[in-house]
Amino acid sequence: MAHRQDIQFISEGLKCKGWFFKAPCSEKAPCVILAHGFCGVKELRLSAYAEAFVEAGYHALVFDYRHFGDSEGEPRLLLDIKKQHQDWRAAIRFAKGLPGVDSHRIALWGTSFSGGHVLQIAATDQDPDIVAVISQAPHMNGFATAAASGPVQSIRLGIAAWRDLANMLMGRSPYYVHSCGFPGDLAAMTAPGVVEAVKKLYPPGFEPDERVAARIFLSVGLYSPGRFAKRLGIPWLVQVAARDLTTPVKPAIKAAGKAPKGELIIYECGHFDVYVSPHFQQTVGDQIRFLKRCL
């Protein structure tokens, strides 16, 4: 098992906490930076990816966003896209300064919602030290994601969002909804099998708080990072789950085709299948082969 150490860095005055997995090499090595998707925390199998990257000769930095997991931030479980972008940039700065890291060979790894984050950050910041991006089952188009929920569910989530916003304006605690639920539940993801699939990501004895402040649903439909694909000039691996019922696949396929150096791989599985065996071995293997060509 790879050596793992607890780390923390500052993002906009608050501590983001995470893990650093150090590659067993004497010379400086590239670093892959990873963070989870919608409401996800690092314990949900990000260490499995990090350990695979370390075995391939790369350092790996995994972190929780502010307001989630072990990181600071009040209120808890507040998903703010701008803040998460700030956290990514803070993580990149921090990783560049870690002992043993080749600061000019940084790769970004995002999954689901963060698969869009890493595209937009790399495309807009144009940081020459970021040399590769991986987006796994990524969110690319907000309108498509909202439409996939159906009109009734979209209205229900919109009402919840306005209720949460009203709470904020009155100084009250957030109005929360669950990130995943059964069909018909008031939750962000309610496709058949989602609840069971997410639980497969839990390590033994770990029970995360799977709620989110509902105000995020006023923003999701407007968040379309796929529009930045044509501006991304570095290698970008896009991995799509063909039977994804949570994140629409067509926008990801379209975005990959627009990127000058986009590479698309489609897997015959569902959204959450990519995290676990047998599809995990296939997807992470493709990621490592991609990194070996780029780093």
Regions found by a protein language model. Give the residues of each.
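Conserved alpha/beta-hydrolase
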Residues: A52-E72
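Catalytic active-site module of serine/aspartate enzymes centered on a nucleophile-bearing elbow/loop
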Residues: Y267-L295
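Catalytic nucleophile-loop/oxyanion-hole region of alpha/beta-hydrolase
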Residues: V41-R45, F68-S103, V276-T283
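Alpha/beta-hydrolase-fold enzymes
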Residues: L119-Y202
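The serine-hydrolase catalytic nucleophile loop
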Residues: F38-E51, Y65, K250
